[in-house]
Amino acid sequence: MGIKGLTKFIADTAPNAIKEIKIENLMGRVVAIDASMSLYQFIIAIRDGDQYGNLMNESGETTSHISGLMSRTIKLMENGLKPIYVFDGAPPELKGSELEKRGEKRQKAEELLIKAKAEGNLEEIKKQSGRTVRVTKKQNEEAKKLLTLMGIPVIESPCEAEAQCAFLTKYEMAHATATEDADALVFGTKILIRNLNANASSNKNKNKNSSKRGYILTEINLEQVLKGLKLTMDEFIDFCILCGCDYCDTIKGIGSKTAYNLIKEYNCIENIIKNIDQNKYQVPANFKYVEARQSFINPKVLEKSEVKIDWCEPKIEELKTFLIKEHNFNEVRVTNYITRLLKARKVTTQRRLDTFFTTCTKKSTKLIIEESQKEVLKTKGKGKKREINNDSSTKLNAKKKKTNVKDEKKNNEKVDELKNKSDENLVKDEEDDQDDYDQNIFDEKTNSESGNIKNENVKEDVSSNDITMDIPKCTNDIVC
């Protein structure tokens, strides 16, 4: 679920904290990805046929998560991004009540799905299918194996994946956390990226002009959130608990706006409870806000010394066996994936170097042009001054003026030459970028039947092999 209404409240109250970015803005960046959330999105988005069933192998086992994960990971790498996938561990005890509620919702959705199938209601089938999707323990293990064979770093969190992702940004081992769960901000991630997998498949019904905007992501900056809301991190955590989180109930009658006003006035939940009208606002009998607060401040995560991040060479033959023999993927398709994977690994490194040197070259050229222009103006000024102050030496002044004009002409030629050179570099860079972009575009059959993404966030329970959630419509050199 994340934090109820948090993203909208931030957008309304601290708009400078949220901005749209293109995936190109993450070129060369290490991004920690909430793997469980990604798998759910792939399973719900990649469907086969009108009945919205998952892609399956010959044994009837779902392969949508494998297809989606492989395709999206390669796509991210082709755009210069360096992904780290973080998997959930055991859910915290405080989350037990929330998991029970999710189980009840899933059971209700399964009943509605059966009814919709009996009636042939395709729209309802599509809606309820998404609500009954589960990411099993086996699917998680298959995803880990796939990523390992591809040479992509995999981290297994002792508890919540988004908490581990957040701490990777604190350790400066990652630039951002990619998840739809806004509670990553409460765990302290410096940057939250949403919609990283929103375009995991092409939707036949999406706006035809949307592709012109590029691959748009949402970036939320925690520092700007706190600055915009004028809250300390401790106050922000208490505010989010009052809004509604996975770890405890909240005070009835208090939404995000009221919670914010109360935190601004009283600073913490303890003071709020002491001062509010409890006839108007019902405080839960067993309000575990202290435990929830500690879960956000000191979550169960791997320490920096325990985290190992290695981008390894892909194990090509093992990868082929896993995809073709074990999961019945088309051999031609797999060969294409592997070719793109190997190329993307080179592109990721090369593009980072190209970006560095191109940036330096452009900057240096610009500075040289500016300095040359200043020299021209300086020369002009000196020439005029000599003419005014040296009337007694007319012939000498005339000679100097002639020299100045000659120098000015020479400097102007130098400026023009540098400008032309700069323009040529810029054009070349733009052409190279377009070539890279064109090479990244691909159309996969498995991605043609995507489900609509809904605006509600819920997390996975790995230990029970179960989740229920809806996907939102809408988000140093390592280099972090």
From Swiss-Prot:
Recorded GO molecular functions are: 5'-3' exonuclease activity; 5'-flap endonuclease activity; DNA binding; magnesium ion binding
Q: Where is this region: N-domain?
A: 1-106
Stretches the record annotates as Disordered: 379-461
UniProt keyword Acyltransferase, yes or no:
no
Q: Name one GO biological process term.
A: base-excision repair
Q: Where is this region: I-domain?
A: 124-266
Compositionally skewed regions (Acidic residues) per UniProt = 429-438
Which annotated residues bind Mg(2+) 2?
D181, D183, D246
Needed cofactors: Mg(2+)
Q: Which domain of life is it from?
A: Eukaryota
Q: Which Gene3D superfamilies match?
A: 5' to 3' exonuclease, C-terminal subdomain (1.10.150.20), 5'-nuclease (3.40.50.1010)
User: What keywords tag this UniProt record?
Assistant: DNA damage, DNA repair, DNA replication, Endonuclease, Exonuclease, Hydrolase, Magnesium, Metal-binding, Mitochondrion, Nuclease, Nucleus, Phosphoprotein
User: Where can this protein be found?
Assistant: Nucleus, Nucleolus; Nucleus, Nucleoplasm; Mitochondrion
Compositionally biased region (Basic and acidic residues): 404-428
- Residues that bind DNA, according to the entry? R47, R72, E160, G244, D246
Cofactor, how bound (note):
Binds 2 magnesium ions per subunit. They probably participate in the reaction catalyzed by the enzyme. May bind an additional third magnesium ion after substrate binding.
- Might you report a single GO cellular component term? nucleoplasm
Which amino acid positions bind Mg(2+) 1, per UniProt?
D34, D88, E160, E162
**Entry similarity comment:** Belongs to the XPG/RAD2 endonuclease family. FEN1 subfamily.
Task: Give the function comment from the record.
Answer: Structure-specific nuclease with 5'-flap endonuclease and 5'-3' exonuclease activities involved in DNA replication and repair. During DNA replication, cleaves the 5'-overhanging flap structure that is generated by displacement synthesis when DNA polymerase encounters the 5'-end of a downstream Okazaki fragment. It enters the flap from the 5'-end and then tracks to cleave the flap base, leaving a nick for ligation. Also involved in the long patch base excision repair (LP-BER) pathway, by cleaving within the apurinic/apyrimidinic (AP) site-terminated flap.
Q: What is this protein called?
A: Flap endonuclease 1
